[in-house]
Amino acid sequence: MNFPSGAVMPEQLPSSRATARAMVMPLALAQFIASYAATNMNVAIGAIAKDLGTTVSGVQTAITLFTLTMAALMIPGSKLTDIWGRKRCFVVGLSVYAAGGLLAALSTGLPLLVAGYSLLEGIGSALMIPPIYILVTVSFPDVKSRARYFGVISGAGGLGAAAGPLIGGLVTSAISWRASFGLQVLVVAWIMVLARKVIDPARSGPTPRFDLTGAALSAAGLFFVVLGLLQSRTYGFAKSRQDFAIGGTVVIPEGSVSPVWLYVAIGALFLVWFFLHVRSSEKKGRDVLLPLRLFRDKVANLGLGTQTVQWLILQGSFFVVSVYLQEVNHDSPIQTGLMLTPATIGILAASAAAGRFARRHPQRWLIIAGFLVAAIGLVLLLVLVRAHAGAWRWVPGLLLFGTGIGTMLTSSVNVVQSSFPDRDQGEISGLSRSVSNLGSSLGTALVGSVLVAVKLPEGKPFAVALIMLLVITLTGLVIAVLIPQVTARTGQC
């Protein structure tokens, strides 16, 4: 039998379910720890600021820089998998991440915290996350197996994000915020031991050249776009809540258009420049960071659209509920983390069932069903917010919302990754992760702006924010309906 260029030979694939599980375990743990790192710091801000003799805003800046570093370097990091190899890139990312965690744990001031957490952990995440999804895609050729193991990884990521505030809060309260970083280092060390069982199917064809200019342009573009979205917490999304100054000179006065749009516009210009560079390079036959052919696939484009909406409503809803519970119900961060547990259970349960779902239903219908269930969950949460309901009444809405998210997250990733041959997995994986990061940032930016801008009695702004998220969820449902019924590569959608 002849195999097409870029195909994986059968002898390179996991030969049994036990082998497959041994391979997926370190990948899932890596996704867990990356998601954990993105959320656990929020409950330790005060303790870190006091211990390091810095300000709360300084620690918040470190958290922002972590997000920016990871978002900006995700696409270049994914391209390196084609040059270094997927497993090698994964292990290098783990090593850089562990070094960052150790430096952060031992930091004596804000500069070392930024170097360890913001930069090294951010770079490590950008290197280790893309290989996770590439390795699953190239190692499991059929859509049902991919769904099963993407479900495991999505569940691990959801658990890490949800458990971050809870575990981080408990560790910080019981021991120290430094112990939280130490815990990450230990987990990463364990992952590196387990990673020896990861199979990296050989990639056919010549090793591509790294497009340094494209990497710089894409990183700058994503950096400024995400920075703008994150700055909405300070300045607001539409109108600026305070003066925006550069070098002591007020550039945008309070009440004018928010500087968020200045950052986003700068980022958009860099991204336009990036795409012009890619088009010019492709015409000259040069290797590029992100081939334009990736954007000509209708299924993948719609799948990326659903991913954006999913992460937007996930982060946006968690943000709304978290702020509501702490500001209106006066719950502690740890209590808030416990209150979000039903959503986490829903995500985990649906992700664990992804393989069984994929055997019975097309991926397209799973995405549609996920949006419908998530919308019902949001409606229940909206009713509870308006009624100022007690704690236990939040369970059904959060459980349904989490179940909907878990159902469609795995399917959307599967649809996007399965739309391309093995030779394009590095690029599409980085693009997919970048889109997810943008969705997450946009979710908190939009919700934060609504909560500040809406001048209504206690609890009403939260209802408005949930209504906005419900409308966006229904928009995602429309996008999912537009996904074609069948694709040539996966055989189903």
List each model region and its residues.
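Intrinsic disorder in cytosolic terminal tails and internal cytosolic loops
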Residues: 1-19, 204, 483-493
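Multi-pass alpha-helical transporter architecture, strongest
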Residues: 195-196, 278, 468-493
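Transmembrane core module of solute transporters
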Residues: 20-69, 176, 255-262, 283-413, ...
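Hydrophobic transmembrane-helix bundles of small-molecule transporters
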Residues: 174-305, 469-470
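Helix-loop-helix hairpins in multi-pass membrane proteins, especially solute transporters
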Residues: 82-214, 422, 426
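A generic transmembrane-helix signature of 12-TM secondary carrier transporters
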Residues: 31, 94, 100-101, 116-117, ...
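Membrane-interface helix termini in secondary transporters
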Residues: 47-49, 78-79, 83, 170, ...
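A late C-terminal transmembrane helix in Major Facilitator Superfamily
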Residues: 419-455
